[in-house]
């Protein structure tokens, strides 16, 4: 899914409280559905099993538009990782967080720097 959304909104994980984001719910449901129906999309799949070896995340620009979203970004990211691992039954699933560049090395906007710092945590 590629869309201009925030971790504080449509991607909001259950452990962050409030309304769980529609994109979070859709992602979890979509992954589970795909795994239950591998043969439908991969006709040569012979049921030998599979392994999910990691999760890539590249997001954060829209959270950098709001001081409130920046303030909770790190907590939301920690909760997102914890909840994805729980919801997919993969307690040790590795995550790779791609940092948001936001204007390159010379970035000076506090909100953007806040998200970048949270992504490094």
Regions found by a protein language model. Name each.
Residues 1-121:
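Cell-envelope and extracellular/periplasmic
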